Amino acid sequence: MASVTLSEAEKVYIVHGVQEDLRVDGRGCEDYRCVEVETDVVSNTSGSARVKLGHTDILVGVKAEMGTPKLEKPNEGYLEFFVDCSASATPEFEGRGGDDLGTEIANTLYRIFNNKSSVDLKTLCISPREHCWVLYVDVLLLECGGNLFDAISIAVKAALFNTRIPRVRVLEDEEGSKDIELSDDPYDCIRLSVENVPCIVTLCKIGYRHVVDATLQEEACSLASLLVSVTSKGVVTCMRKVGKGSLDPESIFEMMETGKRVGKVLHASLQSVVHKEESLGPKRQKVGFLG
């Protein structure tokens, strides 16, 4: 993961600021930086989104392809996650430097979506045991400026909201053989319900307090962080500790409560933005180099 080197004086300055609920950029401990969300940014995908969180820049594309259901879940489709850490994001990702981080992020996404409540995978089934939709979720890290997991989870949810899957009809002839017919109408499609798709809230322990949406400088002052996967209703679906340090049980409970509280606000803001952008349709102004 991208990192910065700080002097002891800089670390003391950051830690003391956090204790007083006044971070270097003027935010409080539970405040996010400005989040920019843009959907439908890649034309050759079923759905896409780009999220900028401070200096962190994430692009997510979703492609729907037909596949065969898994043996243990014959009536469901499934999601596959791929994470590419661009060398332009940080020099540390040159060569195979970003492979470990990409695998770590993909595994975290699998854990978050490995339950029946996040996405109704039965809507992706075309013909039980024979055909289903497979959603390939490609995550590209364009720039790393701290708080990667939160930005990625926001981008994934926005891209899934933007995803349109062609409606399919299964036709059976007199001999019992089946034919699959895809609708030619681009508006005749199915959409996933993302109401229960969680977002990650990362809480970094700095000194005796914890902060959300840490910058690279703040991450350098933290020995342990807690990733909390929260739904729009404030339900925690998954937790994971990262970092070399340890967390006492009381701190974990406090961080969970903060994650639930902040997560509900994050979901409400994201939902408002994507619905507003969709309502504008072609009239919306596209920004960024993909516009």
UniProtKB/Swiss-Prot annotation:
<dbReference type="InterPro" id="IPR001247">
    <property type="entry name" value="ExoRNase_PH_dom1"/>
</dbReference>
<dbReference type="GO" id="GO:0034476">
    <property type="term" value="P:U5 snRNA 3'-end processing"/>
</dbReference>
<protein>
    <recommendedName>
        <fullName>Exosome complex component RRP42</fullName>
    </recommendedName>
</protein>
<dbReference type="GO" id="GO:0000175">
    <property type="term" value="F:3'-5'-RNA exonuclease activity"/>
</dbReference>
<keyword id="KW-0539">Nucleus</keyword>
<keyword id="KW-0271">Exosome</keyword>
<dbReference type="GO" id="GO:0071035">
    <property type="term" value="P:nuclear polyadenylation-dependent rRNA catabolic process"/>
</dbReference>
<comment type="function">
    <text>Non-catalytic component of the RNA exosome complex which has 3'-&gt;5' exoribonuclease activity and participates in a multitude of cellular RNA processing and degradation events. In the nucleus, the RNA exosome complex is involved in proper maturation of stable RNA species such as rRNA, snRNA and snoRNA, in the elimination of RNA processing by-products and non-coding 'pervasive' transcripts, such as antisense RNA species and promoter-upstream transcripts (PROMPTs), and of mRNAs with processing defects, thereby limiting or excluding their export to the cytoplasm.</text>
</comment>
<feature type="modified residue" description="N6-acetyllysine">
    <location>
        <position position="116"/>
    </location>
</feature>
<dbReference type="GO" id="GO:0016075">
    <property type="term" value="P:rRNA catabolic process"/>
</dbReference>
<dbReference type="InterPro" id="IPR027408">
    <property type="entry name" value="PNPase/RNase_PH_dom_sf"/>
</dbReference>
<dbReference type="GO" id="GO:0005829">
    <property type="term" value="C:cytosol"/>
</dbReference>
<comment type="similarity">
    <text>Belongs to the RNase PH family.</text>
</comment>
<dbReference type="GO" id="GO:0071028">
    <property type="term" value="P:nuclear mRNA surveillance"/>
</dbReference>
<dbReference type="InterPro" id="IPR015847">
    <property type="entry name" value="ExoRNase_PH_dom2"/>
</dbReference>
<dbReference type="GO" id="GO:0005634">
    <property type="term" value="C:nucleus"/>
</dbReference>
<dbReference type="GO" id="GO:0005730">
    <property type="term" value="C:nucleolus"/>
</dbReference>
<dbReference type="Pfam" id="PF03725">
    <property type="entry name" value="RNase_PH_C"/>
</dbReference>
<keyword id="KW-0698">rRNA processing</keyword>
<dbReference type="GO" id="GO:0071038">
    <property type="term" value="P:TRAMP-dependent tRNA surveillance pathway"/>
</dbReference>
<dbReference type="InterPro" id="IPR020568">
    <property type="entry name" value="Ribosomal_Su5_D2-typ_SF"/>
</dbReference>
<dbReference type="GO" id="GO:0003723">
    <property type="term" value="F:RNA binding"/>
</dbReference>
<keyword id="KW-0694">RNA-binding</keyword>
<dbReference type="GO" id="GO:0006396">
    <property type="term" value="P:RNA processing"/>
</dbReference>
<keyword id="KW-0963">Cytoplasm</keyword>
<keyword id="KW-0597">Phosphoprotein</keyword>
<dbReference type="GO" id="GO:0034475">
    <property type="term" value="P:U4 snRNA 3'-end processing"/>
</dbReference>
<dbReference type="InterPro" id="IPR050590">
    <property type="entry name" value="Exosome_comp_Rrp42_subfam"/>
</dbReference>
<dbReference type="GO" id="GO:0000177">
    <property type="term" value="C:cytoplasmic exosome (RNase complex)"/>
</dbReference>
<dbReference type="GO" id="GO:0005654">
    <property type="term" value="C:nucleoplasm"/>
</dbReference>
<dbReference type="GO" id="GO:0006364">
    <property type="term" value="P:rRNA processing"/>
</dbReference>
<dbReference type="Pfam" id="PF01138">
    <property type="entry name" value="RNase_PH"/>
</dbReference>
<keyword id="KW-0007">Acetylation</keyword>
<feature type="modified residue" description="N-acetylalanine">
    <location>
        <position position="2"/>
    </location>
</feature>
<dbReference type="GO" id="GO:0000467">
    <property type="term" value="P:exonucleolytic trimming to generate mature 3'-end of 5.8S rRNA from tricistronic rRNA transcript (SSU-rRNA, 5.8S rRNA, LSU-rRNA)"/>
</dbReference>
<dbReference type="GO" id="GO:0035925">
    <property type="term" value="F:mRNA 3'-UTR AU-rich region binding"/>
</dbReference>
<dbReference type="GO" id="GO:0101019">
    <property type="term" value="C:nucleolar exosome (RNase complex)"/>
</dbReference>
<dbReference type="GO" id="GO:0000178">
    <property type="term" value="C:exosome (RNase complex)"/>
</dbReference>
<feature type="modified residue" description="Phosphoserine">
    <location>
        <position position="177"/>
    </location>
</feature>
<comment type="subunit">
    <text>Component of the RNA exosome core complex (Exo-9), composed of EXOSC1, EXOSC2, EXOSC3, EXOSC4, EXOSC5, EXOSC6, EXOSC7, EXOSC8 and EXOSC9; within the complex interacts with EXOSC2 and EXOSC4. The catalytically inactive RNA exosome core complex (Exo-9) associates with the catalytic subunit EXOSC10/RRP6. Exo-9 may associate with DIS3 to form the nucleolar exosome complex, or DIS3L to form the cytoplasmic exosome complex. Exo-9 is formed by a hexameric base ring consisting of the heterodimers EXOSC4-EXOSC9, EXOSC5-EXOSC8 and EXOSC6-EXOSC7, and a cap ring consisting of EXOSC1, EXOSC2 and EXOSC3.</text>
</comment>
<dbReference type="GO" id="GO:0034473">
    <property type="term" value="P:U1 snRNA 3'-end processing"/>
</dbReference>
<dbReference type="GO" id="GO:0006401">
    <property type="term" value="P:RNA catabolic process"/>
</dbReference>
